[in-house]
């Protein structure tokens, strides 16, 4: 199991909605395919005001999927899975999600009817397998989609194909909208070593704000990009103003 970003940044006193992404697929772990869904969802969730806390990449193994989904479901408001929902032998995400919640895998009559209507006489066992769902799961329908999104409690099961993943998420994205993040960015010509103590001081004095420092070695106009972020707009502005006091005024290229 590969986990990215398992540590949590400072949490604002304002309650944040949190999310985890579970990417499922041996092909991702072996380098046969490149995951594009997590990076897309990271950007989308942040724009919606949802704090991503965890990204997990795991193999196509039922028990591993069940354990990861259960853990992420317990610790986050939303969980999004990517991959493992096709008709072949290695598509075991549905079984893993069902096991995470102690449920059986059952054939959903609405999905079966949709599949039979779509494929007609071409329906077979492999295609009908796409109607299998964890018992008690929800089908989320939208006008923009032919096929619904499957949800099991706070877990949203999405396909691994990037085009389909995006379409399905975009159809349901507004249900996740939360209070937005407020971000200010300072670009400075000062070296990161020279501003480190000042950043530490401001971070300590403004615990409700997350401050990031990102040096660059390829730009001529600035050397460090500093981001100040929080759900609380006034807190961001106070931290920004304090940082501007500490930085050499002539070194600040721009503030966004």
State what each model feature region is.
Residues 246-256:
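Conserved short beta-strand edge segments in small beta-sheet-based binding/regulatory domains
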């Amino acid at each position: 199991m590969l986990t990215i970003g398992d540590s949590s940044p400072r949490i604002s006193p304002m309650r944040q909605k949190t999310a985890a992404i579970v990417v499922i697929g041996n092909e991702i772990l072996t380098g046969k395919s490149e995951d594009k869904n997590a990076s897309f969802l990271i950007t989308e969730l942040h724009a919606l005001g949802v704090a991503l806390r965890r990204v997990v990449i795991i193999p196509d193994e039922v028990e591993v999927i069940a354990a990861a989904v259960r853990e992420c479901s317990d610790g986050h408001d939303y969980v999004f899975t990517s991959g493992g929902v096709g008709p072949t032998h290695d598509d075991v995400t549905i079984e893993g999600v069902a096991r995470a919640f102690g449920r059986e895998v059952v054939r959903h009559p609405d999905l079966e009817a949709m599949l039979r209507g779509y494929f007609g006489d071409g329906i077979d066992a492999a295609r009908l397998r796409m109607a299998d769902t964890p018992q008690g799961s929800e089908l989320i329908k939208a006008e923009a989609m032919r096929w619904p999104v499957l949800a099991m409690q706070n877990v949203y099961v999405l396909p691994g194909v990037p085009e389909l993943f995006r379409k399905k998420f975009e159809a349901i994205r507004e249900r996740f909208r939360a209070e937005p993040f407020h971000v200010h960015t300072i670009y400075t010509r000062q070296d990161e070593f020279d501003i480190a103590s000042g950043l530490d001081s401001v971070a300590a004095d403004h615990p409700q704000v997350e401050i990031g420092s990102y040096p660059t070695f390829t730009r001529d106009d600035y050397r460090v990009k500093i981001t100040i972020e929080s759900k609380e707009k006034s807190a961001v502005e106070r931290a920004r103003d304090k940082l501007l006091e500490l930085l050499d005024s002539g070194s600040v290229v721009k503030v966004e």
